[in-house]
């Protein structure tokens, strides 16, 4: 517990320059003298939320894959072994991990004969809404309000950006896809209302400029970009002035934050230079700011989220990790098959194991993010303690296009609302919406009585003795 003394500066202090607006991290100087750091920080900054969709299910959701614990561990409760699972890379963060196995996403299923075959084109819209999309190829879309947007509407309205939506692969939010469904359903996981899908950002440069480059006029922003100078070069005078007003701890915190801003900016600039050099690209259709490397692209997006959370520019992110129909090859995973063909494993054990390599590789991106959050101090603790990260898929076995035993886990402390270090295996037929309802309550939306097709709240601290003993 630390009491603050000295000069007070407003929480919403920005460093402004030509075509630049840089928010500040939470500093001691932002707390009125005589107040307690931890109490103010907890009151001022609600839980940060990240919702990540892994597309097209998991190898461990196949019946044979479940017996091999290819997705989640065999043991329930706290004494689980992650080694054989796709979550093995999360072992260093097991105390922040809540695995929720055996839930179904029934709203992604076909409800009418004419909807059969449209699983690819419904699923993403269902993940965070747990609602059944209206079949249409036009603009009269209808599904539900997503969990991230319900949270943003309640806890994100006093931040400069209520929420941001990111993606890794190319999307096309226009026209019809197939089986009578518009591509908007395929491409959107965040819905501000049942009829309002939110656009997503693939290019780290665009995301960076939204977070830090929104100041000044359009002409000033264009000029800043043309100079190829750092965004920080336009605020050096204001930084120097602010440093004279801060104590040693705040100066160190400010310098580290600005160093992180500059570091991600340099990486984006290097990527743009590489991708406009005339050399051939693995992703020729991608914007110049998008790395050809899946890992580097994902890390850039995670780093931008950490910066946004530390400066409270936004408290809510969603991230779509890919597309169901992706033909991308993830060589680093150890599989040389394109994603979508690999997912259709034909129930062959060797092919199921091959797809599990891709699942494991995708999950292995997350520890980088968790470590970065853990490295940002805020009050008496760090950002990982104050963040909830939902990671899952609305698809179960991709080979069958079913939505049973869908993969889902949660990472982070959620401001003390999640115990962590726990594997829950729900009874057969439990809707994923039950888990989402409980997560909404953990986020502070305690007055929500239902969500999607939920039937009850799911206890996130269920005693291991009351659970079954089969993983998935």
Regions found by a protein language model. Give the residues of each.
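Ligand-binding pockets and gating/stacking loops
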Residues: 1-472
